[in-house]
Design a protein with these regions (language model features):
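Glycine-rich phosphate-binding loop
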Residues: 66-68
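Non-catalytic substrate-recognition and accessory regions of acyl/acetyltransferase enzymes
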Residues: 1-63, 74-166
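Hydrophobic positions on the alpha1 helix immediately C-terminal to the Walker A/P-loop
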Residues: 71
Length: 166
């Protein structure tokens, strides 16, 4: 896991964008000239860190069942209450930087299929408590932990899927 610390000698943009384009995009959504934009300032006041879940990969047989949101929540629960957790609900590209040497068996998707899957991913993540901080945000954020927990959600999921198989 990468960690970035601002010692005050660089602008936040340089720190975010210099690390990865993903963090640069989060900066563009949350900051203007190194200050939180007013639309998110009240929501984020008091948080110390931004944790970015860059990718979640499920085996094909587990996709489309709402497990991605539960897994994202379980990851978020590993961090402190002073951390805001962010992710972007978008399917991974088989040729993208998160799939070096084609390690993961990812399908090639049309633009329409990507948008359809992104909507499903967003619904799964929002079902686990993630939300956009403002209309038009491409990222979803978890700013505090709500009930149910990831464990409670997986127990519910398991019960629902046992009934389907029975």
């Amino acid at each position: 896991m990468d960690q970035i610390i601002n010692d005050g000698t660089c602008s936040l943009f340089d720190i975010f964008d210099g690390h990865s384009s993903d963090l640069g995009h989060i900066y563009e959504e949350l900051f203007d000239d190194d200050e939180l934009i007013p639309a998110v300032e009240d929501e984020l006041l008091g948080y110390e860190n931004i944790v970015l879940i860059k990718s979640i990969i499920l085996k094909p047989e587990y996709r489309g069942q709402g497990l991605g949101g539960i897994l994202a929540l379980a990851i978020a629960e590993l961090f402190g209450e002073q951390d805001i957790v962010a992710l972007k609900p978008w399917p991974m590209n088989p040729d993208g930087p998160d799939n070096p040497a084609g390690v993961w068996d990812l399908p090639r998707l049309t633009e329409t299929a990507q948008k359809t899957i992104a909507k499903k991913l967003g619904k799964s993540y929002m079902g686990a408590g993630f939300k956009p901080l403002f209309k038009g945000s491409s990222h979803l954020f978890l700013t505090h932990y709500r009930n149910p927990t990831a464990t409670q959600l997986i127990d519910t999921w398991h019960k629902e899927h046992q009934n389907v198989k029975a």
